[in-house]
Amino acid sequence: MIVSDKIILGLDPGTTTMGYGIIRIRKNKMEMISTGVIHLHKLENHELKLKKIFEKVSFLVDEYLPDEVAIEAPFFGKNVQSMLKLGRAQGVAMAAVLTKDLPIQEYAPRKIKQAITGNGNASKEQVAKMLQSLLKLKELPKKLDATDGLAAAVCHFFQGGKPDSGKKNYSDWD
């Protein structure tokens, strides 16, 4: 299947560090445009963190003009307060994308790992090394949160950007 040229933004939501990765698809080949992290750990309260997430995701969308966005779904943990905060962070990132009328797909962490490495239980380091190979990167990003964002974008490309039972499409909630 030939995929038309497009830019995909991948997001890995977090409450202390949020990772992102941006890839360009040209003639069905992937190229990394940018990757990085949004540092949130120095901000005093959760509301300021949410504000920064919204602003930075909005900036990334305005700067790189992605055609589609992929976001990692929160994993299920035992600490309810942490899960609520993570859900808010993801929701704010999604709201920033949706205000720009972009389609967004959500992928479970296991689905992303499976798409990148062939193993849904792969470590972050294994995912990073496979991304290095797939994207022909000379060196890995310094933060694994950045590679997680990049992995979401690559997973979305591998899935063809089409909804299936493993992901949710938030572009058409009418």
What is each residue range found by the language model?
Residues M1-D174:
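Phosphate- and other anionic-substrate recognition elements at nucleic-acid/protein interfaces
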